[in-house]
């Protein structure tokens, strides 16, 4: 190839890469949703019709200057506020996640100075995990037909601790909505005879805890780390933001900031920096656990190992990979999962979604196994050749197979 042609090809390739970046960037911009909002009061019949005022933010679009619910179904994040911190202190949180395609649910209960009941707040969060599913079935609701099954519990400080109380009950009852729990500087809720640290023992869903290294309000060694250590999740991650504080996960709040100024020392990053670091990890984690996109887990892992802004601890057990077992012409996955997909020569076999599959042609077969949490795994290829001896068992006795010789 001539030098001019090589240079021309390089220019074309460079332009193609730039064009691809522009297209991707443009797609990301237009993929962002507007934010819809409404407030409602739910009643919990199991607690004497306790009133639970709830603020709900949801993905929306603007049509003719009116805000309407975006088309689609969106995962849910139920969020618990901190002690003496109103739900609107977390405007930074809903403005981050709702445009990315999440419904955010904020109970406003248990905001008093002397009457705060951590157990009741935990029950409020627990109640909303299932109640919001009913809201999606209510044709008078702004989020009618918009609620996805997958749900996260998330909370800050007191609300973080209460989220672990809620997850304890949900995991024990076998709730199938809760897919992950996230604590932002979660506080040990030891009042009212409960304990977030103790509750962590019963939590099995994937978990993520973010902590500021300089948090003096809920010191990590007394609060965040014991909760993390007690978790029974098969995938859990603890992230310590270097130089971070307790209150910087939220917007300014006079009560939290006064406590921080008297209890925390050595905070060396800004509120904006701490939130930026947090959102980088949270977006990846939520896309992995709630949107079930396993490619984001790989990016999450890369960020953990390459970030200079954090230190971390992690225990994540990988889901097992199946072997294919053949018995009399039937292929079976060696691993039991929640779902299956069989492949022939790297192509999906329609309706082949059971633990076993009976092939009728030669080829290379794989089985993909799905699990309650974590990523699916796919087996090594199995070369299947039809055994005529086995095939004869399925031929009626008054039929036979003959070689078709040419005349």
Task: Please place each PLM-identified region on the residue numbering.
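Gly/Ser-rich "nucleophile elbow"/oxyanion-hole loop immediately N-terminal to the catalytic nucleophile
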Residues: 67-73, 117-161, 168-173
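Active-site glycine-rich loops that stabilize anionic/oxyanionic intermediates
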Residues: 74, 81-85
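Short amphipathic alpha-helix adjacent to the substrate-entry channel of hydrolases
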Residues: 88-107
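The feature captures the conserved acid-bearing segment of alpha/beta-hydrolase catalytic domains
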Residues: 175-249
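Alpha/beta-hydrolase-fold serine-hydrolase catalytic core, especially in secreted/extracellular enzymes
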Residues: 243-245, 252-319
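Surface-exposed, flexible coil segments in extracellular/virion-facing regions
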Residues: 341-360
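Surface-exposed, proline-anchored Ser/Thr-rich loop/turn motifs
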Residues: 323-329, 344, 391-407
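N-terminal cap/lid segment of alpha/beta-hydrolase-fold proteins
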Residues: 32-72
């Amino acid at each position: 190839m001539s030098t001019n042609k090589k240079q021309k090809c390089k220019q074309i390739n460079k332009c193609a890469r730039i064009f691809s970046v522009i297209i991707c960037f443009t797609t990301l911009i237009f993929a962002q949703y507007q934010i819809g909002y409404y407030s409602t009061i739910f009643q919990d019949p199991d607690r004497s019709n306790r009133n639970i005022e709830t603020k709900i933010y949801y993905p929306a679009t603007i049509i003719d200057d009116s805000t309407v619910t975006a088309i689609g179904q969106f995962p849910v994040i139920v969020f618990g506020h901190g002690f003496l911190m109103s739900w609107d202190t977390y405007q930074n949180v809903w403005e981050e996640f709702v445009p990315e395609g999440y419904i955010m649910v904020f109970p406003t209960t248990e905001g008093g100075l002397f009457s705060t009941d951590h157990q009741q707040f935990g029950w409020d969060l627990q109640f909303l995990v299932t109640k919001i599913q009913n809201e999606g079935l209510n044709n008078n609701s702004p989020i009618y037909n918009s609620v996805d099954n997958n749900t996260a519990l998330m909370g800050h400080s007191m609300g973080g601790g209460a989220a672990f109380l809620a997850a304890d009950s949900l995991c024990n009852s076998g709730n199938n909505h809760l897919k992950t729990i996230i604590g932002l500087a979660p506080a040990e809720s030891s009042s009212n005879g409960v304990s977030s640290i103790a509750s962590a023992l019963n939590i099995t869903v994937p978990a993520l805890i973010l902590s500021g290294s300089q948090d003096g309000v809920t010191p990590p060694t007394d609060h965040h780390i014991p909760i993390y250590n007690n978790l029974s999740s098969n995938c859990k991650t603890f992230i310590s933001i270097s130089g971070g504080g307790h209150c910087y996960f939220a917007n300014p709040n006079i009560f939290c900031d006064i406590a921080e100024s008297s209890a925390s020392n050595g905070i060396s990053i800004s509120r904006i920096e701490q939130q930026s670091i947090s959102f980088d990890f949270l977006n990846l984690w939520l896309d992995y656990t709630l949107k079930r996109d396993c490619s984001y887990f790989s990016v999450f892992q890369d960020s953990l190992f390459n970030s200079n802004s954090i230190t971390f601890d992690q225990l994540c057990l990988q889901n097992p990979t199946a072997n294919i077992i053949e018995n009399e012409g039937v292929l079976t996955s060696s691993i039991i999962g929640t779902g299956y997909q069989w492949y022939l020569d790297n192509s999906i076999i329609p309706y082949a979604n059971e633990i076993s599959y009976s092939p009728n042609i030669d080829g290379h077969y794989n089985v993909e196994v799905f699990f309650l949490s974590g990523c699916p795994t796919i087996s090594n290829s199995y070369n299947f050749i039809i055994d005529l001896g086995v095939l004869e068992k399925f031929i009626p006795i008054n039929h036979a197979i003959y070689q078709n010789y040419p005349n």
